[in-house]
Amino acid sequence: MSSAVDATGNPIPTSAVLTASAKHIGMRCMPENVAFLKCKKNDPNPEKCLDKGRDVTRCVLGLLKDLHQKCQKEMDDYVGCMYYYTNEFDLCRKEQEAFEKVCPLK
């Protein structure tokens, strides 16, 4: 895996990309995720929560694009390590540290 985005600059949300970005997703997309989970809890009909699900997807894809623009090399290195080691955080701490230094959690 050479990049976390395709040729047009759109994020490719693979498991390695999502795992590497999980802390950032949790921070930035919390309101959208909470609204979606509340909707799912209150109404078991999946159709009722599609708009909230789209909000979560939009937030995550926007975040991934922002992260890739801000810290492309570090993100690609971290994602590549996670991909190579099947999402084992312990084996990618060096890449994680470099990624979080350039793209800190806010």
Curated annotation (Swiss-Prot):
Its main location: mitochondrion. Disulfide bonds join C29-C59, C39-C49, C71-C103, C81-C92. It comes from the Eukaryota. A motif (Cx10C motif) lies at residues 92-103. Pfam families: CHCH (PF06747). Belongs to the complex I NDUFA8 subunit family. This is NADH dehydrogenase [ubiquinone] 1 alpha subcomplex subunit 8-B.
